[in-house]
Amino acid sequence: MYFHSTAIILFLNKIDLFEIKITHTNITVAFPDYEGPRERDCALEYIRVQFISLNNNKNRKIYQHVTSATDTARIQVVIDMLFDIIISASLKMVGV
């Protein structure tokens, strides 16, 4: 099981569209168990918790980012974080 301890990066992209759609479409269309309000932050937290609850390895790191690909500053932060993860994992593999 090679991927058992591999870090996961959860990208919740197109947040700008999500903010618009959540006011018009109930999130229960995709998540029937959701009982919270039609608010961005509440819905995002629910989605994050649902995703994280599927993780069977509590030592696995899960990085979560809410993004809009058109927001170049935010995307740069995410890219920088990805480089940090890759470098850290590479150093760990060689024992540094």
UniProtKB/Swiss-Prot annotation:
Guanine nucleotide-binding proteins (G proteins) are involved as modulators or transducers in various transmembrane signaling systems. Plays a role in innate immunity and maintaining survival in response to metabolites of E.coli. This might be by regulating the expression and signaling of genes such as lys-8, ins-7 and daf-28. Has a role in lifespan to promote longevity. InterPro entries: Gprotein_alpha_su, P-loop_NTPase. Residues 9-16 are annotated as: G1 motif. One of its GO terms (molecular function) is G-protein beta/gamma-subunit complex binding. Pfam families: G-alpha. This is Guanine nucleotide-binding protein alpha-9 subunit. G proteins are composed of 3 units; alpha, beta and gamma. The alpha chain contains the guanine nucleotide binding site. It comes from Caenorhabditis elegans. Belongs to the G-alpha family. Keywords: GTP-binding, Nucleotide-binding, Transducer. Residues 67-72 are annotated as: G2 motif.
